[in-house]
């Protein structure tokens, strides 16, 4: 079978996807005693499951015929778009209209849509016949799923962040703004904030610098708020979502407890949102309508805010505190380990400051102990010469406290010289 150039690109299994496949195959066979600290799934919180089930049952009873038994608008259902504009206008004092909103089947699809529209070969001043403009990640590491967004080869470029030590066992990344400013091929800037895998949120001065660059280059800055304000608030944010002519804000319900239903939405200026709606119409027609009804109910009733405040935020705060306490207690003092500073998030991101350390070697060692983590290199696109990428790994905070406790003990044992 012959694949097109685009087909060859999109049919390739990314590094992290191969890890996820390895986890799925390993855990599906043999005893069920694996400790999976590599998962990207949000936690299955019973109270969150019950709340979404209740909202879904209400939508089924009242909206099934109108939502599931006929097509709908590609921008999103009128009820959800109205709920979104009302929620954000009231919360942040914005003046959104439906023309500022695009609802899509998951934030991954919205990011893919924006990448296809605003980066790549074309008529943009930064485009060239050989390569076109790029999707630029201003801070690498960042969400590994971004690396599969572009239909053309080498379409995603990461700007390596500088790890800055803090105290004995902490560090924090700093933006490489000089290297970012030197890029003449920016088609779109893309950043998760708070970030995956680090939980790091941009501060006001950093955000001003990124928005200023987007304005000067006349390109969009897409901010992925999957972990931040106003939901799910798993990791604390330092600034509210910015409303700016050159910013596309992307929000999802996945980390609020609804990952399987693939509902997300983008908010931005009409110049960006209108082509995104057209792209969605041509590619997916529209997002699932019954779940749009569910989310509209959650927003307008205030039940989503209560779920986040009373259930989701406390869960991850507790797991973060437990993980930090355990790592401090059991990780060997002889190992130069550092945890990315933060007060929340779905993950712990580690840097082993030792040139002899290799992330995939740790992965294989822990796999023999029936523990899964994620090697750090998969979060660094297009930076093979950066040795830091092989000195990191990610641990999920979504598992049960029992799994976390035993898994962290085995990680400590694997790190001992």
Positions of predicted regions on the chain:
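Conserved core segment of the aminotransferase class I/II
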Residues: 127-132, 151, 243-317, 329-330
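Generic structural signal for small/hydrophobic residues in well-ordered secondary structure
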Residues: 19, 37, 84, 101, ...
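Conserved glycine-rich beta-strand-loop-beta hairpin in the small C-terminal domain of fold type I
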Residues: 36, 310-324, 336-352
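PLP-dependent enzyme catalytic core of the Aspartate aminotransferase-like
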Residues: 82, 86, 90, 95, ...
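Short, conserved charged micro-motifs
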Residues: 356-362, 402-406
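N-terminal "arm"/small-domain region of PLP-dependent enzymes with the aminotransferase-like
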Residues: 1-75, 86-90, 185, 217-219, ...
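Conserved core of the PLP fold type I
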Residues: 65-217, 222, 228-244, 248, ...
